[in-house]
């Protein structure tokens, strides 16, 4: 275990300063800390130690100045401050601590073996004493699936954090201990926010692929999320013991579908039920797992004869791929020189950290084979916290970008990336980017500048916790008693920094909900408030017209899980209405308007005139408001009210009451009254002009189109295609494998309700599908007509009441 006091040693000075040898540093440190042993030291030793102390104190002052200089450079000119300069100016003790840390996530398509793989990692690192399966017969379940729902359904719903220590045996026989903060993420698209917030704070990731299916739909989504946050990754091809396993097909798909250079760093010894182990292409040695749970690693110099030709070919392909992304290997390749083991490892690390390459490992987690070599790959090829560039925004300098420096002595900066309710209150997960977070310290929420005290700091192990007194830069922890929202930034008050927010997708499905019993209303409200705080993609709104509470989310499963959690955790049974699609409205043609709002009845009246036009925008996803007033016919404050009216009108369109997209409004003239004009008048006039012009423009209803991927056994291909055609799906591509096929299609969300039960019936329960929002497009004329009539009827019924 690391000594907390060592982490507080000052940083060394800018490169070039003379430093004490490590032995003398330790002596100095002990001399300072252990005053109680002073009587035991020789009197003659005092001057010598004093000399050392004087030199060390000088270094402390220089180091403090160096750290301050680095911080100033990070704020004033972040582009000029390289990550190498930050690393070079780390204190040796601090540099060693950070070099031994890996913050990683496990991400993949559904059922690729993420949680099973994580369970093996925890077992081999000694974090758990026994292996339990995701759908285990012992009613225990995998450690990282701590929710009852997760264990019942066999899926991961929430990302779960843990930590472990991996002892890696180096090539020279030395053993080095590394600290790994690990987050296991869900694979289902409905819980994509869990992957987003995990990748937002991690330094690296393990992307798991199925040896049979290769790159699947959610693999592509995960790849996109990793690119969004610049997360380096290694790849692990799992399920090598399955029938039809073809790891090199998966490697080819990483190259072709994900468009990232990839090459195998291992070759399997056997496949399917004859899978024995792997050949390491870097060291050219065979690796096997022995023991009841594969805990014993056996390394042999002999490479089996049956794979020698494949090993030679794949090593050549590895070197060629590296030559395309790394200059040093390129020079050796052109000179026809064979790179050494050290050169290959260094090149793979450089290219992986530089987001140019992903090394591919192979194994089978369920059969306990080749997981440990993948763990070695995490250490060898994924970055430590000091090697990753992290930026913040300086609120005091108009949100200019600043570079965060992972020094413990710097002012604290952290990000709350996940909230969870526990038996002890709200649990807030925090990534510390700079400085040190200490128990009892006061920190400031950058969003509202509210000061909060940190009463407890814990390290999480799924649903268990271990209390600590402080956490240094580059680490992940959880704190109790901090009232905040997901995505809030925290500082110690010295810096006005805030972190960039994570990407939060818009909900695509809604349904009405209410408690069956009125006596449950209080618990119902508590549950709604908690779920919204924890999950940014879960929205709760109240529709005044229908007098209904609506919940919105990423899919049917997403909302079903929250309804079930409400029943279990809050004992609230709910009634729900049919699913409602998040339709949108858009303008048709350019329409000019000249609208006058005039109400004068003796007292203060309303007067506002707005003139201009409305038209479609270039991009459907956005709305635009512009003013082109010449001569001051409308004052600035009234124009601000006009923009507010435009935004309010876009929130609820006049066609079917849904949000408006792709509409531009321009006001170029108007008129005011000396006494009767007000901000309210211009806001209302703009809304009225909007509604009138919108309805005259031949508007349309837009419906969400879902990128749908269906996989099923080959004998059901005709039935699946027929199912999709009945739903007016546009089939974009079809892939046929050895015993299964995959269909890629665009389907309207409205047409996909109930699809899962029909798919199960058509494929004898063997088919599966995923949906992800793709884009909005015009709904079919008949559907538009039905939606408009339904909306008008609801409006008429409401007015009758």
From Swiss-Prot:
| Segments forming domain tr-type G | 99-386
The record, for SMART domains, names: EFG_C, EFG_IV
Annotated binding of GTP, by residue: 108-115, 184-188, 238-241
Q: Which is a Pfam family this sequence falls into?
A: EFG_C
Q: Which pathway does the UniProt entry assign to this protein?
A: Protein biosynthesis; polypeptide chain elongation
State the source organism's domain of life.
Eukaryota
Transit peptide start and end: 1-24
Q: Which UniProt keywords apply?
A: Elongation factor, GTP-binding, Mitochondrion, Nucleotide-binding, Protein biosynthesis, Transit peptide
Task: State the similarity comment.
Answer: Belongs to the TRAFAC class translation factor GTPase superfamily. Classic translation factor GTPase family. EF-G/EF-2 subfamily.
**Cited function:** Mitochondrial GTPase that catalyzes the GTP-dependent ribosomal translocation step during translation elongation. During this step, the ribosome changes from the pre-translocational (PRE) to the post-translocational (POST) state as the newly formed A-site-bound peptidyl-tRNA and P-site-bound deacylated tRNA move to the P and E sites, respectively. Catalyzes the coordinated movement of the two tRNA molecules, the mRNA and conformational changes in the ribosome.
Q: What is this protein called?
A: Elongation factor G, mitochondrial
- What organism, scientifically named, is this protein from? Aspergillus clavatus (strain ATCC 1007 / CBS 513.65 / DSM 816 / NCTC 3887 / NRRL 1 / QM 1276 / 107)
């Amino acid at each position: 275990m690391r000594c907390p006091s060592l982490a507080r040693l000052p940083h060394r000075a800018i490169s070039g300063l003379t430093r004490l040898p490590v032995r003398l540093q330790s002596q100095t440190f002990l001399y300072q800390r252990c005053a109680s042993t002073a009587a035991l030291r020789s009197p003659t030793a005092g001057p010598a130690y004093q000399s050392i102390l004087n030199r060390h104190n000088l270094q402390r002052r220089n180091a403090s100045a160096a750290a301050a200089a680095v911080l100033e450079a990070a704020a004033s000119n972040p582009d000029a401050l390289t990550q190498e300069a930050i690393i070079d100016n780390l204190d040796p003790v601090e540099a060693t601590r950070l070099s031994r840390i890996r913050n990683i996530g496990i991400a993949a398509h559904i059922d690729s073996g993420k949680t099973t793989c994580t369970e093996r990692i925890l077992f081999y690192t000694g974090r758990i004493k026994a292996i339990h399966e995701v759908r285990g017969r012992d009613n225990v379940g995998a450690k990282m699936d701590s929710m009852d729902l997760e264990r019942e359904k066999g899926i991961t719903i929430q990302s779960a954090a843990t930590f472990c220590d991996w002892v890696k045996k180096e090539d020279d026989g030395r053993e080095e201990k590394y600290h790994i903060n690990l987050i296991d993420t869900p694979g289902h698209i409905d819980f994509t926010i869990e992957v987003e917030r995990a990748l937002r704070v991690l330094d690296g990731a393990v992307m798991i692929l199925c040896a049979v299916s290769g790159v699947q739909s959610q693999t592509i989504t995960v790849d996109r999320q990793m690119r969004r946050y610049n997360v380096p990754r290694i790849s692990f091809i799992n399920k090598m013991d399955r029938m039809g396993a073809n790891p090199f097909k998966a490697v080819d798909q990483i190259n072709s579908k994900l468009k990232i250079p990839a090459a195998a760093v291992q070759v399997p010894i056997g496949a399917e039920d004859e899978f024995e182990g792997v050949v390491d292409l870097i060291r050219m040695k065979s690796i096997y797992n022995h023991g009841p749970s594969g805990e014993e690693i056996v390394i042999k110099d002999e490479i089996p004869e049956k794979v020698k030709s494949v090993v030679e070919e794949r090593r050549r392909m590895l070197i060629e791929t590296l030559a395309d992304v790394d200059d040093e290997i390129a020079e050796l390749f052109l000179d026809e020189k064979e790179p050494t083991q050290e050169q290959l490892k260094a090149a793979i690390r450089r290219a992986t950290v530089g987001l140019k390459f992903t090394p591919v490992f192979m194994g089978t987690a369920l059969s306990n084979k080749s997981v440990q070599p993948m763990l070695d790959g995490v250490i060898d090829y994924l970055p430590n916290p000091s090697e990753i560039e992290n930026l913040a925004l300086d609120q005091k300098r108009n949100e200019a970008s600043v570079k965060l420096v992972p020094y413990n002595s710097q002012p604290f900066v952290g990000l709350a990336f996940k909230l969870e309710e526990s038996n002890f209150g709200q649990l807030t997960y925090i990534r510390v980017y700079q400085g040190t977070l200490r128990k009892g310290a006061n920190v400031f929420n950058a969003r509202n500048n509210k000061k909060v005290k940190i009463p407890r700091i814990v390290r999480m192990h799924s649903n268990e916790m271990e209390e600590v007194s402080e956490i240094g830069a580059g680490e992940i922890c959880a704190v109790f008693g901090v009232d905040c929202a997901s995505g809030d930034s925290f500082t110690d008050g010295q810096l006005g920094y805030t972190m960039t927010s994570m990407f939060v997708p818009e909900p695509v499905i809604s349904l009405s909900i209410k408690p069956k019993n009125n006596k449950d209303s209080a618990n119902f409200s508590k549950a709604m408030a908690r779920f919204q705080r924890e999950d940014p993609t879960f929205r709760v709104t109240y529709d005044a017209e229908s007098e209904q509470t609506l919940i919105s989310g990423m899919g049917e499963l997403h909302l079903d899980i929250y309804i079930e959690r409400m029943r279990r955790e809050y004992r609230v049974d709910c009634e729900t209405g049919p699913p409602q699609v998040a339709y949108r409205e858009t303008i048709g043609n350019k329409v000019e308007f000249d609208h006058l709002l005039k109400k004068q009845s003796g007292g203060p009246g309303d007067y506002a005139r707005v003139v201009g036009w409305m038209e479609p925008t270039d991009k459907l996803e956005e709305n635009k408001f512009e003013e082109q007033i010449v001569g001051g016919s409308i004052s600035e404050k009234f124009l601000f009210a006009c923009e507010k009216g435009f935004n309010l009108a876009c929130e609820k369109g006049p066609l079917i009451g849904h949000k408006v997209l792709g509409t531009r409004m321009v006001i170029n003239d108007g008129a005011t009254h000396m006494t009767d004009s007000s901000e309210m008048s211009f806001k209302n006039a703009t809304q009225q002009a909007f509604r009138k012009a919108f309805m005259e423009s031949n508007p349309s209803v837009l419906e969400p189109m879902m990128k749908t991927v269906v996989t099923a056994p080959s004998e059901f291909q005709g039935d699946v295609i027929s199912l999709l055609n009945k739903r007016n799906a546009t089939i974009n591509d079809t892939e046929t494998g050895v015993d299964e096929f995959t269909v890629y299609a665009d389907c309207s969300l409205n047409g996909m309700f109930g699809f899962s039960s029909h798919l199960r019936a058509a494929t004898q329960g063997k088919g599966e599908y995923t949906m992800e929002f793709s884009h909005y497009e015009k709904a079919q004329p008949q559907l538009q007509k039905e939606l408009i009539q339904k909306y008008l009827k609801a409006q008429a019924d409401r007015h009758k009441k």
